[in-house]
Swiss-Prot record:
It catalyses: myo-inositol + NAD(+) = scyllo-inosose + NADH + H(+). This is Inositol 2-dehydrogenase. Its EC number is 1.1.1.18. It is an enzyme of class 1 (oxidoreductase). Homotetramer. InterPro entries: Gfo-Idh-MocA_inositol_DH, Gfo/Idh/MocA-like_OxRdtase_C, Gfo/Idh/MocA-like_OxRdtase_N, MI/DCI_dehydrogenase, NAD(P)-bd_dom_sf. It comes from Pseudomonas fluorescens (strain SBW25).
Length: 336
């Protein structure tokens, strides 16, 4: 039997997930949608030829007996409300990042899930489902390069819109590294410093770009992440792990190598959706499969909380350009 899904939010990522769950993935059926713009929700249903009902709001959708699991892809500040409602209804919920817009909101979700007594929440961090990151983690975990000592990373976008602000380099961009690097290293952060190199002439007046984020983990690993969102040349994700006895590097996406016009070249992707489309498919299929098996897995509410705590420290460090300490409370045994 297909898992009956309700989707809250039919913007770009919501529409893409609805398409994915109704046309690409196995054992799922989108039976309910809603959005703050109900006309947009109805248009998505019509465009994708869904046999789905448009609900007046997220709470009506969550509490519908037709809905077995919920996808939250709405405006970020609404996420906490709908995730808490799904937990209260006892329904599994996949929530796109951010889990909540504050660390306190994430902690409320953690507390609600622990009180319920069963994992219901998966957070939409997709990089742990990327083949390249999985291969990199396998090398680290094997001990082939010894203990990781340093990581050199970069997150580069060709351009960003006028509404992109300096702190969004953390909350919208670096947040993916904050999650995936914890997962790669099985380690937590203890401090961060943000420094600003010479500003790019391609950056808008209100935006400080690029930025360099310097992280330290509890085990002493040092991480530098270059965030450069106006690099012009493409969407480029880099991660190099320097170990005691070797170096492991995130593989580049598979592209045709071209020999032409006295040049040897490889194309660089321009869009994040193209770079991680496979990871999005694997991520949501894993959610569907785990719900059908009776136990939600993947990035947890605790992972969402940990990322939010780190992001708050990074934003503080942006303002001071000094080293900012951070720490997490003890992880509930509930999360393993």
């Amino acid at each position: 039997m297909s898992l009956k899904l309700g989707v809250i939010g039919t913007g770009a990522i919501g529409r893409d997930h609805i398409r994915r769950c109704s046309q690409t993935l196995l054992n799922s059926q989108v039976v309910a949608v809603t959005d703050i713009n109900l006309e947009q929700a109805a248009k998505v249903v019509a465009d994708l030829k869904l046999d789905a009902e448009v609900y007046p709001d997220g709470h009506a959708l969550i509490n519908s007996p037709q809905v077995e699991a919920v996808l939250v892809t709405s405006w970020g500040p609404s996420h906490e409300e709908f995730v808490l409602a799904a937990i209260a209804a006892g329904k599994p919920v996949f929530c796109e990042k951010p889990l909540a817009v504050t660390a306190e909101g994430c902690r409320r979700i953690v507390d609600a899930e622990v009180a319920y007594g069963k994992r219901l929440v998966q957070v939409g961090f997709m990089r742990p489902y990327d083949e390249g990151y999985r291969a990199l983690k396998a090398v680290i975990d094997s001990g082939q390069i010894g203990e990781p000592l340093m990581l050199h990373c970069a997150h580069r976008n060709p351009t960003v819109g006028e509404n992109y602000k300096t702190d969004m380099a953390i909350t919208d961009t670096l947040i993916h590294e904050l999650d995936v690097l914890r997962w790669l290293l099985n380690d937590d952060y203890v401090s961060v410093q943000v420094v600003f190199p010479r500003k790019s002439s391609k950056a808008l007046a209100h935006l400080r770009d690029p930025q360099i984020v310097l992280l330290e983990t509890a085990k002493g690993t040092r991480i530098d992440v270059e965030v450069f969102v106006n690099c012009q040349y493409g969407y480029d994700i880099q991660c190099e792990v320097v170990g005691e006895t070797g170096i492991a590097k995130l593989p580049e996406p598979s592209q045709v190598q071209l020999r032409s016009g006295a040049k040897l070249s490889n194309a660089i992707l321009m869009d994040w959706k193209d770079r991680f489309i496979g990871a999005y498919d694997v991520e949501l299929q894993a959610f569907i499969d785990s719900v059908r098996a009776g136990q939600v897995g993947g990035p947890s509410a605790w992972d969402g909380f940990a990322a939010a705590v780190a992001a708050d420290a990074c934003i503080e460090a942006q303002g001071s350009e000094q080293i900012v300490k951070m720490s997490l409370p003890d992880r509930p045994r509930f999360y393993g």
